[in-house]
């Protein structure tokens, strides 16, 4: 940030291809594009849409083309929780049709309108759509007790695949669209960040029949003495306490949080708990076998835990910790109270079949009372085992031992391992990948659970409120597919660090940051989550990391803050009402010693119009749902069936739209028609087939299993980025990009499409998958650009692979690029810290057999596999995929 003069890179001297469009010009403007009206910026999204409806009605009545169109006051409608209005598609070059809403639409209540588009005319696809909110939930004011922007749940918490619910199961099946919701009850790793309002008076009003919680969409009856449940229609009495505060002073019930807001939290009274909320409890199981010593994992994990002790959740100072070291033996540590001395004893148990607990009272200890001795132990553990050459790792017996220590209270078992479990119960063998990789037997033989222990043990853990998290860091096979079941069924997670070595500070930084954020996120225990639907709706399938205790109850020994869930919904009977309701309730014990209930409610309009169903479909939520079904297909019938399922789902929707909507409402010739709110959905579905979780080809089993595991639980924004990476052109980014704005926030450049057709051979690009970043430097980049970014003019001197950019004091551009990377790594809602991989593009001047040729080729292949609009191995480009869909739907 010195007085360094901005450099203009002379890219024009290279003639390898057309200059890519600036990020704000993702595709050329068409003749039909018009500037937005300035007045609209002062309207709410609902008001803006309704103004458009009124304009259309007024214009039509003036022309005597439409009759009996009601004039609606736009101020009587609220669209809660959505920041932007429904966006009509931008006209693009070559568009030959008039984009007007069409189809059979409801009269008398506001609904989203259908805007037709031609998918071929939308190429390259407008990726800014990926950051748009879903189609709005338009709910009239008379449906809400106290109309407000917070009366309906934000899509950050809950997104339904359809924001207009079909009134019959027949219409749902006819649409070929899924009905499900994507749920994320907690939005941050720490509960103190932007919490919902908390009711502390102990007055929790619920329907006595369906047990739903009172919410902004109920109806008060008989002068306010009773309320009608909007879920089952039962009239309930209003308790006297509802109109009083905690001191018994009368209050206005319409000011209550649960009446004004869709997301609210209650301090639960004692009848919601079977015991006193337990303390936060952690059992750390450290692999101390040869692999963990050799790659430095043990030392890294011990040091990170030591440095994180101050940040462990310990609000009530009741947090307890135990540490086990494991090779072929279970090593317990007896840690005395600080006031009783500092003599720490290590006790070894070699009987793996029936491990006993020597002196359990001194092994599961208070963080507050034993803090100094815990620090001493963590600093000594790497030295104690530094000479260990034993290759055995008894994971199963260690888990049972840790479970025995904490089962009386519950909590987390956190395993840090570099070795395949190879002794004792749960022993696993290396699988023969070469013979079945990329065949029909791959899923059944490489991704199935190798030992029933890893599923059966989770039943015991759920009974005793114990979650298991795994951190696997190795350059060898660890059978991710088997051990990840431990977290999958206990509300936990499995994290994977292939090729980890403490000799590489990039690996150390990634592991340390993620491990630290994981163990310091807020811990809630004894959690259950239940979803309710109003009459006609039923939760039928559940996807995510939890234990499905009953038909509609999901159990979590501890509740994570960085995962999401998918619930499939069935329509069991004809819906007669104009609106339906969904409600999520999470009951848990916080580490503050409080029992709390978080309630999330959403109101969704219903329809008997197929056009309105399509106009309200949420393309991002649909993609998440289909990924869960595809994962099911992988495990039941293999990868080929999963890819066919994804392609067939797109084909069926396109065919249905063509037959039921487009053909009956338009004349002439768009080659491949769909509605604007779904125009990115075929791209996302096609991108899924190219993801490591599903694509064909020889992929190491651990990597494949880890990719599937991530898709099971990633929150929606990170899920979308993982399957369709964000790509930024840096060498020509706007002047303000990479610098702080007036609020101190780093400005990011606009992303470009994930295709190599926009890459120049002299350019600098950043690809961000949320898990990894690739900084791609064109092989023919000018020396000035190379110098400004890397501090050298010789492109061959740049170290490729995992790395970080050097800090160049006199290069503003270097600082701007680093700022962009830092900004993309900033998260308070997920633990992931993406590794940066520096990739050098090909060049005719590149030496044939330079020292890093093999590594560079591998990196290029990995990076270009993220450009999902291109061919990835034998797959179609996105244009070819659309052409194949056109052919199939024309038959």
From Swiss-Prot:
Assembly and partners?
A: The COPII coat is composed of at least 5 proteins: the SEC23/24 complex, the SEC13/31 complex, and the protein SAR1. Golgi apparatus membrane; Peripheral membrane protein; Cytoplasmic side.
Q: Where is this region: Zinc finger-like?
A: 207-232
Give the residues the record marks as binding Zn(2+): 207, 210, 229, 232
Which family does the UniProt entry place this protein in?
Belongs to the SEC23/SEC24 family. SEC24 subfamily.
One GO cellular component this record assigns the protein to is:
Golgi membrane
Question: What are the recorded GO MF terms, alphabetically?
Answer: signal sequence binding; SNARE binding; zinc ion binding
Primary localization: cytoplasm
The major lineage groups are: Eukaryota, Fungi, Dikarya, Ascomycota, Saccharomycotina
Q: Name one GO biological process term.
A: intracellular protein transport
Q: Which Gene3D superfamilies match?
A: beta-sandwich domain of Sec23/24, Sec23/Sec24 helical domain, Severin, von Willebrand factor, type A domain, Zn-finger domain of Sec23/24
Instruction: Indicate how the chain sits in the lipid bilayer.
Output: Peripheral membrane protein
| PANTHER family on file | SEC24-RELATED PROTEIN, SECRETORY 24AB, ISOFORM A
InterPro entries linked: ADF-H/Gelsolin-like_dom_sf, Gelsolin-like_dom, Gelsolin-like_dom_sf, Sec23/24_helical_dom, Sec23/24_helical_dom_sf, Sec23/24_trunk_dom, Sec23_24_beta_S, SEC23_SEC24_subfamily
Q: What is this protein called?
A: Protein transport protein SEC24
- Pfam families given in the database record: Gelsolin (PF00626), Sec23_BS (PF08033), Sec23_helical (PF04815), Sec23_trunk (PF04811), zf-Sec23_Sec24 (PF04810)
Instruction: Kindly state which keywords UniProt assigns to this record, in alphabetical order.
Output: Cytoplasm, Cytoplasmic vesicle, Endoplasmic reticulum, ER-Golgi transport, Golgi apparatus, Membrane, Metal-binding, Protein transport, Transport, Zinc
Q: Where in the cell is it found?
A: Cytoplasm; Cytoplasmic vesicle, COPII-coated vesicle membrane; Endoplasmic reticulum membrane; Golgi apparatus membrane
SUPFAM superfamilies per record? beta-sandwich domain of Sec23/24, C-terminal, gelsolin-like domain of Sec23/24, Helical domain of Sec23/24, vWA-like, Zn-finger domain of Sec23/24
What this chain does, per the entry, is described as: Component of the coat protein complex II (COPII) which promotes the formation of transport vesicles from the endoplasmic reticulum (ER). The coat has two main functions, the physical deformation of the endoplasmic reticulum membrane into vesicles and the selection of cargo molecules.
């Amino acid at each position: 940030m010195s007085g360094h003069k901005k450099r203009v890179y002379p890219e024009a001297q290279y003639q390898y291809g057309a200059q890519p469009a600036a990020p704000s010009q993702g595709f050329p403007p068409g003749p039909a594009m018009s500037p937005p009206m300035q007045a609209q910026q002062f309207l709410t999204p609902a008001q803006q849409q309704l103004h458009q409806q009124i304009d259309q009605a007024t214009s039509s009545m003036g022309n005597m083309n439409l009759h009996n169109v009601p004039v609606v006051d736009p101020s009587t409608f609220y669209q809660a929780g959505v920041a932007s209005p429904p966006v009509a598609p931008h006209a693009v070059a070559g568009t030959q049709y008039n984009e007007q809403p069409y189809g059979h639409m409801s009269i008398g209540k506001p609904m989203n309108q259908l805007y037709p588009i031609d998918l071929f005319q939308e190429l390259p696809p407008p990726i800014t759509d990926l950051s748009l909110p879903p189609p709005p939930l338009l709910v009239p004011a008379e449906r809400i007790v106290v109309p407000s922007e917070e009366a309906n749940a934000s899509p950050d918490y809950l997104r339904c695949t359809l924001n207009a619910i079909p009134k019959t199961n027949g219409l749902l099946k006819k649409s070929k669209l899924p009905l499900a919701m994507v749920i994320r009850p907690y939005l941050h790793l720490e509960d103190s960040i932007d919490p919902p309002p908390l009711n502390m008076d102990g007055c929790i009003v619920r329907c006595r029949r369906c047990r739903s919680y009172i919410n902004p969409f109920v109806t008060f009856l008989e002068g306010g003495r009773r309320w009608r449940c909007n879920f089952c229609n039962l009239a309930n009495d209003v308790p006297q306490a509802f109109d009083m505060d905690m001191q018994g002073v009368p209050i206005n019930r319409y000011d209550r949080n649960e009446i004004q807001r869709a997301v609210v939290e209650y301090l639960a009274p004692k009848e919601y708990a079977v015991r006193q909320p337990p303390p936060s409890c952690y059992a750390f199981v450290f692999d101390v076998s040869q692999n963990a010593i050799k790659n430095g994992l043990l030392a890294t994990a011990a040091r990170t835990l030591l440095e994180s002790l101050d940040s462990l959740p310990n609000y009530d100072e009741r947090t307890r910790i135990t540490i086990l070291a494991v090779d072929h033996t279970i090593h317990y540590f007896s840690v005395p109270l600080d006031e009783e001395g500092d003599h720490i004893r290590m006790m070894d148990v070699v009987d793996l079949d029936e491990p006993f607990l020597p002196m359990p009272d001194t092994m599961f200890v208070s963080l507050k009372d034993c803090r100094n001795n815990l620090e001493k132990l963590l600093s000594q553990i790497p030295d104690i085992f530094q000479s260990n050459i034993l290759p055995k790792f008894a994971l199963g017996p260690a888990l049972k031992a840790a479970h025995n220590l904490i089962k009386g209270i519950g909590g987390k078992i956190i395993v840090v391992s570099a070795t395949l479990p190879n002794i004792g119960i749960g022993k696993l063998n290396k699988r023969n990948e070469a013979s079945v990789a990329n065949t029909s037997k791959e899923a059944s033989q490489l991704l199935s659970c190798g030992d029933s222990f890893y599923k059966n043990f989770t039943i015991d853990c759920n009974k005793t409120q114990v979650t298991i998290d795994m951190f696997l860091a190795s350059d060898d096979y660890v059978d991710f597919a088997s051990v990840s079941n431990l977290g999958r069924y206990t509300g936990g997670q499995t994290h994977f660090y292939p090729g980890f070595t403490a000799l590489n500070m990039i690996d150390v930084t990634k592991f340390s940051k993620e491990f630290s954020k994981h163990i310091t996120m807020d811990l809630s225990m004894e959690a259950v989550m239940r979803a309710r639907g109003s009459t006609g709706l039923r939760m039928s399938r559940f996807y995510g990391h939890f234990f499905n205790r009953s038909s509609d109850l999901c159990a979590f020994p501890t509740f994570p803050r960085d995962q999401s869930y998918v619930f499939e919904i069935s329509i069991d009977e004809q819906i007669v009402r104009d609106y339906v309701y969904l409600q999520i309730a999470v009951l848990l014990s916080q580490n503050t010693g409080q029992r709390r209930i978080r309630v999330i409610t959403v109101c969704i309009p219903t329809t008997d119009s197929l056009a309105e169903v399509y106009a309200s479909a949420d393309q991002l939520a649909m993609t998440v749902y289909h990924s869960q079904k595809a994962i099911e297909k992988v495990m039941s019938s293999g990868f080929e069936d999963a890819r066919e399922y994804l392609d067939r789902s797109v084909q069926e929707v396109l065919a249905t739209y063509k037959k039921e909507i487009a053909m009956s409402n338009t004349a002439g010739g768009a080659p491949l028609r769909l509605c604007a709110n779904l125009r990115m959905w075929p791209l996302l579905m096609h991108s899924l087939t190219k993801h490591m979780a599903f694509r064909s080809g020889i992929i190491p089993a651990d990597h494949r299993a880890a990719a599937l595991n991530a898709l099971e639980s990633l929150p929606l924004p990170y899920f979308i980025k993982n399957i369709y990476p964000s790509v930024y052109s840096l060498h020509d980014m706007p002047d303000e990009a990479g610098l702080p704005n007036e609020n101190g926030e780093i400005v990011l450049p606009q992303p470009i499409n994930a295709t190599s057709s926009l890459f120049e051979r002299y350019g600098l690009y950043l690809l961000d998958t949320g898990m990894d970043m690739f900084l791609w430097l064109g092989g023919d980049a000018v020396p000035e650009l190379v110098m400004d970014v890397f501090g050298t003019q010789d492109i061959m001197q740049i170290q490729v692979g995992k790395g970080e950019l050097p800090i160049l004091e006199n290069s503003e551009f270097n600082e701007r690029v680093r700022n962009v990377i830092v900004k993309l790594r900033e998260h308070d809602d997920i633990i992931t810290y993406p590794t940066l991989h520096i990739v050098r593009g090909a060049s005719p001047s590149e030496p044939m057999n330079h020292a890093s040729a093999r590594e560079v080729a591998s990196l290029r292949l990995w990076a270009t596999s993220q450009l999902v609009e291109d061919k990835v191995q034998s797959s179609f480009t996105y244009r070819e995929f659309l052409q194949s869909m056109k052919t199939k739907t024309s038959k």
